[in-house]
Amino acid sequence: MPVRAQRIQHVMQDTIINFYSTSDDYGDFSNFAARPIKVDGNTWPTSEHYFQAQKFLDEKYREEIRRVSSPMVAARMGRNRSKPLRKNWESVKEQVMRKALRAKFEQHAELRVLLLATAPAKLVEHTENDAYWGDGGNGKGKNRLGYLLMELREQLAIEK
């Protein structure tokens, strides 16, 4: 690789792309982005709707979540502990998120192109509201959503 290309590659590796709000430049990476996905025969208004609904075994409640007007309401319903969570939720939640993300980026070609164009930058869901899926606002969170997006980006690049 020529020296200049190596320098550009190095600069991109040091680049961090933050996302959180759907109005950000990379807001479509947010699970709240209005990008419907079709999974298991159902169309979900957002990946957030799908993800939150999968926390529950109660089909009626899952359908209620699917039909709510906004991802914010879906997220609130996902935190409802008067409804029992799946017993295995903690062990399957990342698989569920992977499935939602793959559906979103496979079903929306322009998002796939955008995601691939970010390589090899680090993707960070930058928010104080979540230290598991996001960075906790201070960089100390796990940023699992960012890592799953980078993992998907690698897979899509190979499949391209």
Curated annotation (Swiss-Prot):
Keywords, sorted A to Z: Glycosidase, Hydrolase
Disulphide bonds in the chain: none
TM annotation in the entry: none
Keyword NAD: no
Gene3D superfamilies the record matches: YbiA-like
Domain of life according to the entry: Bacteria
Annotated catalysed reactions: 2,5-diamino-6-hydroxy-4-(5-phosphoribosylamino)-pyrimidine + H2O = 2,5,6-triamino-4-hydroxypyrimidine + D-ribose 5-phosphate; 5-amino-6-(5-phospho-D-ribosylamino)uracil + H2O = 5,6-diaminouracil + D-ribose 5-phosphate
EC numbers: 3.2.2.-
InterPro entries in alphabetical order: NADAR, YbiA-like_sf
Record GO terms (molecular function): hydrolase activity, acting on glycosyl bonds
Keyword Hydrolase: yes
Known role: Catalyzes the hydrolysis of the N-glycosidic bond in the first two intermediates of riboflavin biosynthesis, which are highly reactive metabolites, yielding relatively innocuous products. Thus, can divert a surplus of harmful intermediates into relatively harmless products and pre-empt the damage these intermediates would otherwise do. Helps maintain flavin levels. May act on other substrates in vivo. Has no activity against GTP, nucleoside monophosphates or ADP-ribose. Is Required for swarming motility.
Family designation: Belongs to the YbiA family.
Protein name as it appears in the record: N-glycosidase YbiA
Organism: Shigella flexneri
